[in-house]
């Protein structure tokens, strides 16, 4: 518990202290956000707002976990787990890809950075590296960092092992690529209003911190009664999820309306990569659809808008993603953000109830 508190406190201090320093640096370098011309006209005043805020979020999560790991090493002789390193790799690698995208935007002085093809290739390479390492690297607990299958909670309802190990690895790589691409793009789409992505991500990662801690408390081989989980190093996952939630909380102090800084793709892609990796590491890939329900709604609204327009040349929403639809209906930006936070809270609550209900059912209580 002390290691968890240390991680949380370090992450909070890094974001609270580091974000204003980054704002000054970005101002000095003149790295401001460029606003899409087809967006709501009310957003044009945000042009020039410092971006690259995701750098602080990434740094806060890493330093928070490293501080926690150092404490455990000095007091108990515990070495860092590969599971934690892999989850952080997913976050940092996607964050680095987002940083390249953000840097391209400010260099070209426009709202578009990397090409769709370039971003896809980058995500494919990084997700594939993560997938292969997750299956082959050893862990302290003896449980694999990932399962070659699809899970709602814990045990796969569909295993990729049906046709041998090679096929299982190939299918798992495809599955991980889908998850990484889906969640990075989902949180990226959500990052369209001041504080929306940061606040929603904070709520989602609080949910994952609770899930991972419950899996740690009921880890297979423990003395606690009830169903136990064969999850690799869930305490590390708890700490990382908690650090991510706190990092978003600290960043939100400066990102709330009117935002003093944007997280940019450096932040949204990193948070998406971390969310995907947490779902894989905790064996809750399909539960994540509910846990990150707001991100799913944002993504589906964009898909529906594009698909319907291509078929009929008409629009379902005034603008997509759906948060812009409510803006154009006359809702103040702050009202949209707070209500969307409330929706995400409900999704997380539903996911936690389902997770606990599954544990009760499997425990026979």
From Swiss-Prot:
It comes from the Bacteria. The keyword Lipoprotein does not apply. One of its GO terms (molecular function) is UDP-N-acetylmuramoyl-L-alanyl-D-glutamyl-meso-2,6-diaminopimelyl-D-alanyl-D-alanine:undecaprenyl-phosphate transferase activity. Its cofactor is Mg(2+). The gene is mraY. Coiled coil: none annotated. This is Phospho-N-acetylmuramoyl-pentapeptide-transferase. The chain crosses the membrane at residues 2-22, 51-71, 80-100, 118-138, 167-187, 196-216, 234-254, 256-276, 277-297, 340-360. Keywords: Cell cycle, Cell division, Cell membrane, Cell shape, Cell wall biogenesis/degradation, Magnesium, Membrane, Metal-binding, Peptidoglycan synthesis, Transferase, Transmembrane, Transmembrane helix. It catalyses: UDP-N-acetyl-alpha-D-muramoyl-L-alanyl-gamma-D-glutamyl-meso-2,6-diaminopimeloyl-D-alanyl-D-alanine + di-trans,octa-cis-undecaprenyl phosphate = di-trans,octa-cis-undecaprenyl diphospho-N-acetyl-alpha-D-muramoyl-L-alanyl-D-glutamyl-meso-2,6-diaminopimeloyl-D-alanyl-D-alanine + UMP. One of its GO terms (biological process) is cell division. Pathway: Cell wall biogenesis; peptidoglycan biosynthesis. It comes from Bifidobacterium adolescentis (strain ATCC 15703 / DSM 20083 / NCTC 11814 / E194a). Its main location: membrane. Catalyzes the initial step of the lipid cycle reactions in the biosynthesis of the cell wall peptidoglycan: transfers peptidoglycan precursor phospho-MurNAc-pentapeptide from UDP-MurNAc-pentapeptide onto the lipid carrier undecaprenyl phosphate, yielding undecaprenyl-pyrophosphoryl-MurNAc-pentapeptide, known as lipid I. PANTHER family: PHOSPHO-N-ACETYLMURAMOYL-PENTAPEPTIDE-TRANSFERASE, PHOSPHO-N-ACETYLMURAMOYL-PENTAPEPTIDE-TRANSFERASE HOMOLOG. One of its GO terms (cellular component) is plasma membrane. Pfam families: Glycos_transf_4 (PF00953). InterPro entries: Glycosyl_transferase_4, PNAcMuramoyl-5peptid_Trfase, PNAcMuramoyl-5peptid_Trfase_CS.
